[in-house]
Amino acid sequence: MGLACVENKFLKLPNIQKYEVVSRTEDGFIASVEMDDGYEFQIYANFLNRVFPSTVIKLIEKQNKSQKVNILVAPYISERTAQICEDNGMGYFDYAGNCWFVGHSIYLSEKGNKNPGPKEQRSVSIFERTSVVSSRILRELFADVTKTWKLKYLSEKVNCSIGQVSKLMKVLIENAWVEKLPDGYKVIDPESLLLEWSKDYGKKEITSYACYSLDNISAIEERLKELKTDTGIDSYLTGLSGGVRYTPVVRYNKVHVYIAPEDIQEAIRYLDMKEVNSGSNVVIFPLENDSYIKDYRVIGESAVVSPLQIYLDCMQIKGRGEEMADAVLKKEILR
């Protein structure tokens, strides 16, 4: 199937005079291509049953040294792996018919075909909201993306086994988000890692309480401060209302806030709000575990979740959420 998915694409091109496989190799095959203008070249195909971004990066390094025309052939190629290939000029072909190849006067590009084979080779579970241990480890890594981390330190810091940390690191390394160095582990692509995290983070709709208050936004935020003083109930700003505390790049007309599940109804009564199906100006998220408020800060007397949590939450907000997430990422996380 790997041979056919490449051959079919090339033979459909009007400027291809001849395409044939001239030999098999240990990890693929070599094909000869002849153009209608007489130009000939060879393609060195690398076949892999499972492919990760880290695998592709190694192939690209090999290609750069050999100066050969290399392509990747695999049952499934993820969007990120495909992008890495394109950015580095390496062609790719998968069994669903998705492909990309640029060379001489050839331009092949087909995307969006659903893969009928095995599910995407990625570990979604590490990013799910329910993966509390993975979340804690990831949050610790993002406490300082310039730092090199030891497995033992991370396991002690988040109170889990070294095996759990090692398992997570394996996934991060396979996806070229983290690199293993002689003195520890280092995040090498924080933006891509966070983007992937935010995608899975928003896949499952979480419970939230949409409310309406007659007060304006600034008055609501002031009353949230009083909520702590008068009732002892903690609240933590997030979303756009939290993000502007770090970088005021957007205007907003809705307050997003975390409150412990057992305190939500009392908070709604104290704030004189009503739960509504539409037209809300306050959204309360249940504080399901403490990882959401790790490294929170007090800014202007308001408790605000960390820049990392702001990013994850803002990426789920339609409209200007992504703009806020990007601003917080650049100012607070990648600094």
Walk through the language-model features, giving the residues of each:
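Hydrophobic alpha-helical interaction segments
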Residues: 92, 270-335
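Short alpha-helical segments that sit at the start of domains
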Residues: 109-138
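Short, charged, surface-exposed secondary-structure boundary motifs
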Residues: 102-106
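DNA-contacting interfaces and partner/effector-binding or oligomerization modules
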Residues: 1-90
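Loop-centered beta-sheet repeat module
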Residues: 137-198
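Short gly/ser-rich loop at a beta-strand->alpha-helix junction or flexible surface loop bordering the NTP-binding
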Residues: 204-290
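Membrane-interface helix-loop-helix junctions at boundaries between adjacent transmembrane segments
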Residues: 97, 124-126, 153, 157
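Charged, structured surface patches that assemble and position nucleic-acid processing machinery
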Residues: 89-101
